[in-house]
A protein has these predicted regions:
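Short, contiguous alpha-helical
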Residues: 2-9, 17-36, 40-92, 133-187
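Acidic/histidine-rich alpha-helical segments that form the ligand environment
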Residues: 90-133, 145-157
Length: 187
């Protein structure tokens, strides 16, 4: 196998920005592989008393991508479809509302959010490194760095890729740490 068989792998000896973006993309790819190719039943399957579903995770992570790379990065609003959701309850409404979306809508929502995030990150990195300050700030005015946003998103994907691993195994037995060589989404 060659490096081109696993394009989602971070570089062996890259810059800090390349490693952060690479680690994030590896988790994104693994998550997408775990969620890929399912119908509505598979995307809505639950384990035990948990309300988590792969469909809910697709929608949640799409929202997190948009929130980090708009609101937190630049202070801009997220826009559609997030501006029409009633926020403020005990749980994230995107988890429950995913049951109303088709598999095609959920996959497209996540895929487009990730594409937007990659474009926004590339534009941001063209103007500086991970230490540049972003819009997100504490109440006393201390601003977060781009590094912090990337680490937060890596943490979010790490948590939910683990959830996706368990959910997918329960749906159809798919197991594994990494997608197969040259994998691309099928749905």
């Amino acid at each position: 196998m060659t490096d081109s068989d696993y394009p989602w792998e971070p570089p062996l000896a890259g810059t800090e920005a390349e490693h952060l973006a690479g680690a994030l993309d590896r988790l994104r790819t693994t998550f997408r592989w775990k969620a890929d190719g399912l119908d509505s039943t598979g995307l809505q399957a639950r384990l035990g008393v948990s309300e988590l579903t792969l469909g809910g995770l697709l929608k949640h992570l799409a929202r997190v991508e948009d929130e980090i790379f708009t609101v937190k990065l630049t202070g801009e609003p997220m826009g559609a479809p997030w501006d029409s959701i009633a926020w403020g309850g005990e749980t994230d409404p995107e988890f429950a509302s995913a049951a109303d979306d088709s598999p095609e809508q959920l996959y497209a929502l996540w895929d487009h959010a990730v594409a937007r995030s990659r474009d926004r990150l590339a534009a941001c990195l063209a103007n500086g490194g991970p230490d540049q300050l972003v819009h997100l700030a504490t109440r006393d005015g201390r601003q977060a760095s781009l590094r912090r946003l990337l680490c937060d998103l890596i943490e979010e994907y790490g948590r939910h890729t683990g959830h996706a691993d368990l959910l997918r195994e329960a749906v159809d037995g798919r197991v594994g740490e990494d997608p197969p060589p040259r994998w691309t989404p099928q749905s």
